[in-house]
Amino acid sequence: MDLRSELFELSMSEQAQPLMDAVQIHIRDNVDPITEEFFRLNDEKQDRWSWHPRQLELLDGAKNKAKDIGLWNFFLPESDMGAGVNNLDYAYIAAELGKSPLASETLNCSAPDTGNMEVLERVGTPEQKDKWLTPLLNGEIRSAFAMTEPGVASSDAKNISTSAVLKNGEWVINGEKYYISGAGDPRCKIMITMVKTSPDAPPAKQQSQILVPIDTPGVEIVEGMRVFGQDHAPKGHMHIRFNDVRVPEENMLLGEGRG
């Protein structure tokens, strides 16, 4: 097949069809039967920003069933930590998962965890991988990606103003973030946080990414913000302030100015 033909060949591969079949069976047998009860339990919680124990029991049961048959971590195509599914085939599987509000999490394929795990797998140190990537890959914790800021077009990282200054072996972080998806989830333990570390460098080399445990002193979760009128509790889209947040120097990802 020449390059032009290859570029226009966007069908799911034959090799992925058995996997797609297994995903559909998993959703039918293990996800659909728990969905109604899962969301009904929202009405029994005293705190909207928490999970009902039964909700976590239902999720963990479906996750364990998926993991037992290898339906797990589809999003790392070139890593022995993933299922070896290429991006095109994964796109078809993701479309199938999107038909259910719970399916992607039961296969450990939910954002923002998927993107965060890819970053850690590619550029994390052995220590960072052991502390954060392993429990994420196992579906034991959740994570967030803290980039968006108030008042600026935050998809352009050059607009980020949250600062991180190195003092006595620690990064001291100050700033404010908006719409940080998943940061309200009680299971969220770590945030990959976009900061400005090198304000005097060329614009494209001023930004860095730092691992910030969400329970670090100075991390202030102000409120859940609304998207199209919904706050999506308990995962949420959170307004967060960083008030002299201190994390070890080794929490930097890849290197200063390489965010």
Put a short name on every predicted segment.
Residues 139-148:
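A short, Trp-centered hydrophobic/proline-enriched beta-strand micro-motif
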